[in-house]
Regions:
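ABC-family P-loop ATPase nucleotide-binding domains
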Residues: 33-111
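ABC ATPase NBD Q-loop/coupling interface
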Residues: 4-20, 88
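Conserved catalytic loops of ABC-family nucleotide-binding domains
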Residues: 108, 128-149
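Walker B catalytic motif
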Residues: 113-117, 124
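ABC nucleotide-binding domain signature
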Residues: 21-30, 142-144
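Extended, folded domain segments that form the structural surfaces/walls around functional sites
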Residues: 1-10, 39, 130
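Catalytic "switch" loops of ABC-type ATPases
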Residues: 30-35, 148-149
């Protein structure tokens, strides 16, 4: 028998990383990579619209996307200057982690796998991450999932 990992009825081991993302899995890294020349705005718009396309939803217009981005940026208190720069380029460790939490907020995954989320964060960033991770999520059954201790 071949190994399998079932997530919402699908064997994750048979899916590409891209399809795992489409299924709602978010993976953060201990050391997020820099992507020179790719702005956060373009990166996130492509990611969000790919998720929407996979779900059979229309792409967000530029104004809809920018509104969503402003809302999520406010939740994680991401500086507008960071959102307009290349992905993680020249960011401090804490800025990279905050940026990952922003990406997670934008993509609204079903499952987030976080690697040393508190690594390199200052006290303000730790507070934001803690608040964000404690926000109730809604499960497919419609019940709030308050997470575990």
């Amino acid at each position: 028998m071949l190994p399998f990992v079932t997530f919402y009825g699908k064997n994750l081991l048979e899916l590409s990383p891209e399809d795992r993302s489409h299924e709602g899995i978010f993976l953060s890294f201990q050391y997020p990579v820099e992507i020179p020349g790719v702005s956060m705005v373009n990166f996130m718009r492509a990611a969000v619209n790919e998720q929407r396309k996979y779900k059979g939803l229309p792409a967000l217009t530029a104004s809809e996307f920018l509104k969503l981005m402003r809302e999520k940026r406010a939740v994680v208190e991401l500086d507008n200057k960071l959102a307009n720069r290349s992905v993680n380029e020249g960011f401090s460790g804490g800025e990279k982690k905050r940026n990952e939490i922003f990406q997670m907020a934008m993509l609204e995954p079903r499952l987030s796998i976080l690697d040393e989320t508190d690594s390199g964060l200052d006290i303000d960033a730790l507070r934001i991450v803690a608040i964000f991770l404690k926000l109730p999520k809604i499960t497919p059954s419609g019940n709030p999932d308050l997470g575990s201790a």
